[in-house]
Amino acid sequence: QDSCQASTFSVIIVRGSVASWRVRPDMPEQRAAMTIQELRAIAVPVIVRTTEDMLSLVPDTLREAARDHDVILTSGGVSVGEADFTRDVMARLGDVLFWKLAMKPGRPFAFGRIGGHDGAWLFGLPGNPVATMIAFYQFARPALLRLAGVDPVAPPPLLDARSSGAIRKAPGRTEFLRGVLFEADGHWQVRSTGAQGSGILSSMADANCFIVLGPDQTSVTAGEPVAVQLFDGLV
């Protein structure tokens, strides 16, 4: 399977192989491409182009990508801002199968096809870097594995650990906090990596797991058990 990636950010990219492209290290397209590179055994990643947030440029970029590839990954352009055109263009050129997720971070996420029933699958990832990574790991990665013939695709296992501190959460959505799993007093414990903003890459760089809080879950007190998804085998 071939996959390609486009970005709606105004960042300079050298076209060519993954090894030859350049991009600012704090931008989400770099992180998404690194995760695609981890799947090189099943997909050939191609950086198509960086598209500025201009409506006139997005349709041609997606048409070009869909013509020669099976899967398209985009970063940004799927929220509700004035420059978020990707979802509308998807609807014009194909089908939007779903949009918006009850999760944090990663709520702006579009999935569909460009070019009808036999067209390329499109994963419209969020624009903020941490949200891009979480959406890729939770949705795009297992889908790419399935498209490559892996069946079944086992979901990442969830482990139980005690939260070392209090975590504030409102019900209604699944939240993925970046955390550090460690052993203390004969038990597995987990702590958050600190500030959890979707643009704070250090929250991922310092983590070894996700703390997964389900949609019905509310705030967590210190010592309370929580579900943990390890980065090992995922990231």
What is each of the regions a protein language model found here?
Residues 1, 13:
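Phosphate-interaction motifs
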Residues 25:
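Nucleic-acid processing machinery
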Residues 32-125, 129-134:
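Helix-rich terminal scaffold detector
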Residues 91-235:
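Flexible glycine/proline-rich
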